[in-house]
Amino acid sequence: MMLDLGERHTIRRLLKKVNRLAPEMRQMSNSQLQQQTALLREQIKAGKTLEQVLPRAYATVREADYRVLGLYPYDVQVMGAIVMNQGYIAEMKTGEGKTLTATMPLYLNGLMHRGAFLVTPNEYLAERDETQLAPVYEFLGLTVSTAFRKSTDKRKTSVTPKEKREWYGADIVYMTSSGFAFDYLFSNLAGDKEGQFFPKPFNYALVDEVDMVLLDSATSPFVVASAPRVLSTMYKLADDFVVSLVPKLDYVVKRRDKAVWLTYHGVRKAESYFRIEDLFDLKYRELYRHICLALRSHFFMKRDHDYVVRDGKVILLDETNGRLMKGIQVSSGIQQATEQKEGVDVTPLRKTAASVTFPSLFGMFNKIAGMSGTAKVDENEFINTYNMKVVTIPTNKPVIRQDLPAKIYLTTSDKLLDALKEVVKLHQMGRPVLLVAGSVENSEIISELLLNRGIPHNVLNAFNASREAAMVKDAGQEGAVTVATNMAGRGTDIKISEAVRKKGGLAVIGTEMLAERVRLQLAGRAGRQGDPGTSQFYVSLEDDFVTKAMTTRFQKYYRHKVAKKRAGKDIVQLHGPRIRFSLWMLKNRVASSEESQRTQTNKYETTLRLQRATFYDDRNRVIGQDDLQKTVDRWVNQGIEFFLDKHEHWDSVAIKRLVNHHFTYEAVDLPDNLSDREQVRVYLKRLCQQIIDQKATTLITKEQLNTFYRKCLLTALDTSWTDQVDYLNTLRSYVGSWSLAGRDSGYVYNERAYNAYQKLLKKAKMRAIDNLMLSIISLNKKNQLVVQFM
């Protein structure tokens, strides 16, 4: 957005102050420059704000960049750094030095001893940047680390919690977004303080490629799974049935809405196939659910577009950049249905023990900022969802790249043939070409076509991502041709030689219609730092992006043109403002739909985020207490009350059943005076104390008893939380039907989620009694406590 006059004035004012300090910094000795860190920390300790010390801090690290790296940040980079400290997003074009710019806000926020995190998409970039910039921070007396073992670390042992605490305890930490998400989850599942990773609250995060993290990945939760459920045999039955269906007769597919359903004929066919009377009878709902999963897998999960099969496993692809999403699965059974479709081993469907999305994770920081080359396109969503303004930073040199109008074709074959003609021409001129395919499958097809034409080339897709940096580095060589999926849109810069500059620079050729932000990312690979270059996209009405969002009118137009072509009319390229406007409208409609989906998901995630924060606070209180006796007494009293609430009248049979299910498996003789609820409560409390006292005789120290208490309470909490997360995930799947029924889905969801959380607290207390009473405890040879929960 356009900053108001005051904000623009603030940025210019701070830049002038930084520049005025430059001569003073240049005259300092190394020792004097290094002493600035202690001086700045004293000023912060005395009460100065970060903005007040920013000019001196930025001038200090700017000079340190020059002395250590030989690189002196430009004024535009200082402007970007000022924006990043304000908690905004700095849009800086490819090649404008975001890596160097980040040294300034990271140094400034690292002065507080509270941690400054630089979050990148992958370990290669995090390690590269930390290795390059660590000497600057260390020169100035700050500690720096990566939140993972570097590639140079050859140790085979697993990472310990102590190592992770040391990593996250540094002043400045370079990390990956996914690694950080999983560390957060595992840290909050730890059984004691020693198992937790984060020594201090989250303070400042600077997110590289912020649009990819906070938008593209916003709806994909990171999940730690619990024990698997029993594997259903219905996946194979449903898959075999779906394969037998006849299009249009048995099912209808609406790709625009990502909807597929059985027709009346299809329902009757299912009832005949499975020999049942009514497919919609409640007793067959699991069968119907598996049929729906198989339908969705067959028609909306496309191999080498949405996923790949490698080493007998289905691995998802990130549709925005074509990278493998290892460790992430599609939820609600789609993963298992797809595995069945591909004939690989079906993984067990697991309950979710813990989950978090990026919006929830980064919402925990005191301040979050971002940088990207293409955030401006989605600035309204950043403002509405994250309250983060997007500020476009001027380039150091004017951008002279030519972005040529897209060429529009009727069919995919016509499009590819023309695109390849252009590649051959550019290759013969000696210009390097980055040829972008929309999927892994298409990149392999294009590679075959290039081989048939005798054009040597590299292929960069999910199958060889390990060579990404080397391939991208060579992509600017004279005459080089690189076929790549969207993953080539971010990361390592493509540098060109003087000879290539004279020939026109790098040419980016896209072979599919893409979302506007992805298109800008790919086009931005050419023309860095004032270099010449061109970009042009070849699109057809058969591109996935187009077919999934076509209106009925657009489909009629397409079919009409195809009929004419088959009748002999020479229709190859489509011209005119009308078709361009239609495609522009289609692209906007898709973008609006995706934004709406993210907004809706974030609305439900907000409820989970609040419950997660409350739950982890309760859990950490249990971990942090050195003496849990009072807490255990309180939980036992509450748990007994919740058990007694289940019945209004308690006779001896019901009491014995309660005791044998939750207190002891041994036979008990009940007192004769258990005539009312109060007497039953007193009896159960006394029984609990007797059992705990008996267990305590096995132990040697009070610390062991406290450890036993902690294990019992945490296990009760974690089991209850797993059920809660699983319930909320299921609850989301019902939202659509509530909306169709005219109910406020958000209100109903929040109401049911709240009620479920209250039940969680009750269940945790009752499960704690089960754990305390029915567990078996012993000491091993090292006198360490061993607890077996029955």
Predicted segments with their positions:
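Conserved P-loop NTPase motor core
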Residues: 1-566, 587, 593, 598, ...
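Extended, charged helical/alpha-beta scaffold domains that provide interaction surfaces
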Residues: 315, 324-327, 545, 549-790
